[in-house]
């Protein structure tokens, strides 16, 4: 697979927030002058070792998934899977794939066949602990929303784990009154964000 310098939907690399919004040319210029090179890119084969390492460091109450399982999401829908890079280091990643039911896929198993549908299932969002609070997760979600709108998805579903419900509420997701498989861990919550056409 060819290296993707950008997933094609942004008109600028995502730069560090320096005194203003990330879209401010002065902020981007200043960040560049400090030597920061940040971008959201599509996942490529060489990215996976960094993703696995990052996953091990952030999932404490849910067992990390295998490479085969994670790659099954990516191979099914590579255009909705991203990494956030800073100076060529993976600081965060997001995996999402097409889905056709409000019952979430089971963890630890590759995706079944025939999952195409109008739902985009956000399987995983992880950011290095050292980068917490810098807005990386929000930037990855913003990129996913752009892509989802362009591809015509009607909604995004996810299962909030590790007490992350409040974070997801701030991103526009609402809890659903539906139990999820116990493999997602204690307190896991199914959530939805409806996409406006």
Task: Label the predicted regions.
Residues 22, 30-35:
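N-terminal, intrinsically disordered charge-dense segments
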Residues 98, 157-159, 169, 174-190:
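Conserved catalytic-core motifs of GNAT/GCN5-like acyltransferases
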Residues 60-87, 91, 95-112:
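Active-site rim helix/loop that mediates acceptor-substrate recognition in acyltransferases
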Residues 38-51:
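A short beta-loop-alpha structural element at the N-terminal edge
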Residues 90-126, 132, 179-187:
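Conserved acyl-donor/pantetheine-binding loop and adjacent beta-alpha core of acyl/acetyltransferases
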Residues 141, 146-160:
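Conserved GNAT acetyl-CoA-binding A-motif
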Residues 127, 133-146:
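Conserved acetyl-CoA-binding loop-helix of GNAT-fold acetyltransferases
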């Amino acid at each position: 697979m060819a290296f993707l310098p950008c997933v094609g939907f942004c008109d600028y690399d995502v730069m560090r927030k320096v005194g203003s919004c990330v879209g401010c040319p002065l902020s981007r210029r200043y960040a560049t002058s400090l030597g920061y090179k940040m971008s959201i890119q599509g996942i490529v084969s060489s990215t996976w070792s960094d993703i696995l390492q990052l996953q091990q460091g952030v999932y404490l109450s849910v067992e990390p998934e295998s490479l085969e399982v994670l790659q099954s999401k990516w191979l099914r829908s590579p255009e909705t899977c991203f990494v956030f890079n800073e100076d060529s280091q993976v600081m965060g990643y997001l995996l999402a794939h097409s889905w056709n039911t409000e019952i979430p896929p089971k963890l630890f198993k590759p995706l079944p066949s025939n999952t195409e549908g109008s739902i985009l299932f956000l399987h995983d969002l992880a950011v290095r602990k050292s980068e917490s609070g810098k807005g990386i997760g929000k930037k990855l979600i913003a990129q996913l929303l752009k892509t989802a709108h362009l591809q015509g998805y009607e909604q995004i579903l996810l299962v909030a784990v590790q007490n992350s419900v409040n974070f997801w509420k701030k991103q526009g997701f609402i809890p659903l009154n539906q139990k999820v498989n116990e493999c997602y861990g204690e307190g896991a919550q199914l959530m939805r964000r409806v996409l406006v056409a």
